[in-house]
Amino acid sequence: MPAHLLQEEISSSYTTTTTITAPPSRVLQNGGGKLEKTPLYLEEDIRPEMRDDIYDPTYQDKEGPKPKLEYVWRNIILMSLLHLGALYGITLIPTCKIYTYIWVLFYYLMGALGITAGAHRLWSHRTYKARLPLRVFLIIGNTMAFQNDVFEWSRDHRAHHKFSETDADPHNSRRGFFFSHVGWLLVRKHPAVKEKGSTLNLSDLRAEKLVMFQRRYYKPGVLLLCFILPTLVPWYLWDETFQNSLFFATLFRYALGLNVTWLVNSAAHMYGYRPYDKTINPRENILVSLGAAGEGFHNYHHTFPYDYSASEYRWHINFTTFFIDCMAAIGLAYDRKKVSKAAILARIKRTGEESYKSG
């Protein structure tokens, strides 16, 4: 079956995709509590339980001197050691066994999906719903990735969207490439991040037992799934050297996953084009999408954060959307939310680059 036909088949099978259209109704729910497919204003979406990932243009940075940077030396030392170990791991690549390459790819993809399909599109934005087996899979992948637990990751990400490019944005790209890439993890949070972050509604995350279970046991979970397991499996099962297992399969793989995610915060906010909203910093960056499983269509994502594809195009350089659609085909994902073509074209005309031809 041709790829585009397969995509249509999977996208329409077993579950519904809610289409967001435009304009002009503000009705979000019917009497039975189900989401309606009614036209909405472009700035609105149909997630009545989720409003805190929508950009708030009324928030402005406070005037006056900026607070002094407070370095977190523990993080600086640990990140430096991690990247030194990862660099050494690169030199070991030619000496690794084929099963180790496969293991690293498997572990990388599991961790990536735990971030992209899990912490990002499911828990931060509620762009689709997942049944328990899929949620467990994504929680495990998220723990393997070790980029903060789902609760903290989602809280920071919602703040990033709502207060984007301000002092309340945890990785504000206006503070430079290095800060938005990794520097924000090496210093104390700006007071505005804590102040505005505390105003976010996180009740949906607190109410989810699986998310809170992961948060409660996150440290031992990370120790086991991010460091011990990926090191011991190659060493024990196919007699890989301990050196290769530690520095390549574990430290290099972990550092690679971190930096690819960080590029969404840094490169995808600085380099690329802005077809959907030229008034905001996030850009469409194909190279970032290649590494980050489809997360580089960032101008679209910040314009329509409620679209489960995080892109106008579902499977185009977007492994995460392919994965979610496959999960929908077997009944594990449902209620995927997708912005309509009419809404996209209207938004391009209003705030985007009119020379851009929507596909």
UniProtKB/Swiss-Prot annotation:
Q: Where is this motif: Histidine box-2?
A: 157-161
Which positions does the motif Histidine box-3 occupy? Answer: 298-302
GO MF: iron ion binding; oxidoreductase activity; palmitoyl-CoA 9-desaturase activity; stearoyl-CoA 9-desaturase activity
Query: Mainly localized where?
Result: endoplasmic reticulum
Q: Which PROSITE patterns match?
A: FATTY_ACID_DESATUR_1
Which residues does the entry place in the Cytoplasmic compartment?
Answer: 1-72, 119-217, 264-359
Q: Which reaction does it catalyse?
A: octadecanoyl-CoA + 2 Fe(II)-[cytochrome b5] + O2 + 2 H(+) = (9Z)-octadecenoyl-CoA + 2 Fe(III)-[cytochrome b5] + 2 H2O; hexadecanoyl-CoA + 2 Fe(II)-[cytochrome b5] + O2 + 2 H(+) = (9Z)-hexadecenoyl-CoA + 2 Fe(III)-[cytochrome b5] + 2 H2O
**Taxonomy, superkingdom:** Eukaryota
Give the residues the record marks as binding Fe cation 1: 120, 125, 157, 161, 301
Judged by the first EC level, this protein's enzyme class is oxidoreductase
Q: What is this protein called?
A: Stearoyl-CoA desaturase
